[in-house]
């Protein structure tokens, strides 16, 4: 079954042909470990976990190498460490922040049903590779030293021979457009506004390492060079797939291409570039100022969103209802709908043995067409094919959820209490209205009598 993927660079869907079918290689940009991951961060984790699972199915579990990095050196980490542990030396407080945040990230994405990557390298473990690449770039005339910084020159790249790609090709921007669109002051040590930092001097107390390019003072890497170094170390100069969020296309991924191709004199860093779309919450951009900023942990463990906690399988399915390249609107209604499907499928497959699911796989091989995939899951349910549905859920990392293991949210509890009060005062019109509102939330109300003959109301998640 042929796999077709949309390539951000060529702007077209193409047949996927790995450089080496016995060693399929994928790199995805991972978290900067300074705080809990938010729901927008969960989207690429889930999307590329599905792709990882599909590649393992198509090429064999032992023939796919998935690398997702951990960024553990960054200004945001330094600021968080100084704020949370003011009494400790900065290096020690940074270690506490990064180790704790990495554990939190793993707990959260494990709950979402995601497999661990084959390799999960930390940036600080690859400083030597970063220095090697930087030295090559300086020697090749693509980078220069200024005021103890090392900067990359996109202009030098575009003036070089035709083997190299054009800087700006991935983001479909020209250098002139980038210069015209610059909205920040250009540092005085830069030769050109588009030049970007490969290495910079460390401030007193900050993490620091011996510098490349003959610089006497110690320093630390820029963000972009980290991923070039880690992908090179674990996947080679050129590999099959590079993924991440659409917000990383420029400047991060554009700069990765520039660094890697110029350092290794290659025309491509990755054969296929894949990017997932943006996420908004209830129709608005997610932001702390709007009060709609929500972390994975808050969705799993608190009642912040929709007035209740949510199971990881529900979050996963809700994320997959929208095609990965399209923007997604994260809503409580979508979570209720996903949960209803999960409960139904879980009940239906509880005694099933995982079977083949060719139609589901066919949908996924069409550029991860998860809306079509979900339609196929519903079709299997309607056709009574429990084994096939069970196999599809297993392939997709959708864990069965036992009915009753999800807490009833505060809003629903309040509505049920209000309906009970309405029935007690014989306000049946209000009682029926609340019943319909609960039904719209996926909660079925049943009225009956207890062993003493007194009225009693029970509820269940509707099928």
Curated annotation (Swiss-Prot):
Gene Ontology molecular function, alphabetical: ATP binding; cysteine-tRNA ligase activity; zinc ion binding
Subunit structure: Monomer.
Keyword Amino-acid biosynthesis listed: no
Covalent S-S links between cysteines: none
UniProt gene name: cysS
Keyword set, alphabetical order: Aminoacyl-tRNA synthetase, ATP-binding, Cytoplasm, Ligase, Metal-binding, Nucleotide-binding, Protein biosynthesis, Zinc
Residues annotated for ATP binding in this entry: 288
Source organism per UniProt: Rhodopseudomonas palustris (strain BisB5)
Name of the molecule in the record: Cysteine--tRNA ligase
EC number(s) given by UniProt: 6.1.1.16
């Amino acid at each position: 079954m042929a796999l077709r993927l949309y390539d951000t660079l060529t702007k077209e869907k193409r047949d996927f042909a790995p450089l080496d079918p016995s060693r399929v290689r994928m790199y995805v940009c991972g978290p900067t470990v300074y705080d809990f991951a938010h729901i927008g961060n969960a989207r690429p984790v889930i999307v590329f976990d599905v792709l990882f699972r599909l590649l393992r199915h198509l090429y064999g579990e032992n023939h796919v190498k998935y690398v997702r990095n951990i960024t553990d050196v960054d200004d945001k980490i330094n600021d968080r460490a100084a704020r949370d542990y003011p009494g400790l030396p900065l290096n020690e407080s940074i270690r506490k922040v990064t180790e704790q945040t990495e554990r939190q990230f793993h707990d959260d994405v494990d709950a979402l049903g995601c497999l661990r990557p084959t390799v999960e390298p930390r940036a600080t473990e690859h400083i030597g590779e970063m220095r090697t690449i930087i030295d090559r770039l300086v020697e090749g005339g693509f980078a220069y030293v200024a005021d103890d910084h090392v900067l990359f020159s996109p202009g030098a790249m575009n003036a070089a021979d035709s083997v190299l790609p054009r800087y700006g090709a991935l983001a479909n921007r020209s250098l002139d457009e980038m210069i015209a669109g610059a909205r920040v002051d250009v540092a005085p040590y830069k030769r050109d506004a588009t030049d970007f930092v490969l290495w910079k001097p460390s401030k007193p107390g900050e993490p620091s390492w011996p510098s490349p390019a003959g610089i006497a003072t110690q320093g630390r890497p820029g963000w972009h060079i980290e991923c070039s170094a880690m992908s090179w170390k674990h996947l080679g100069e050129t590999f099959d797939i590079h993924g991440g969020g659409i917000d990383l296309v420029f400047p991060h991924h554009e700069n990765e291409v520039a660094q890697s191709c110029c350092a290794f004199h290659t025309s491509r860093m990755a054969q296929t570039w894949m990017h997932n779309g943006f996420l908004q919450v209830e129709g608005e951009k997610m932001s702390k100022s709007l009060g709609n900023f929500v972390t994975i942990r808050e969705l799993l463990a608190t009642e912040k969103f929709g007035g209740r906690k949510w199971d990881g399988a529900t979050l996963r399915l809700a994320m997959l209802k929208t095609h990965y390249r399209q923007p997604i609107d994260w809503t409580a209604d979508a979570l209720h709908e996903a949960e209803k499907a999960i409960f139904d499928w879980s009940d239906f497959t509880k005694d099933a043995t995982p079977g083949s699911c060719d139609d589901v796989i066919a949908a996924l091989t069409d550029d991860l067409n998860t809306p079509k995939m979900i339609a196929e899951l519903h079709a299997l349910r309607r056709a009574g094919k429990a084994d096939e549905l069970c196999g599809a859920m297993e392939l997709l990392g959708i864990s069965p959820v036992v009915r009753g293991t999800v807490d009833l949210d505060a809003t629903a509890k309040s509505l049920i209490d209000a309906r009970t009060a309405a029935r007690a005062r014989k306000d049946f019109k209000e009682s029926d209205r609340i019943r319909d509102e609960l039904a719209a939330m996926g909660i079925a109300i049943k009225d009956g009598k207890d062993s003493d003959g007194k009225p009693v109301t029970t509820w269940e998640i509707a099928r």
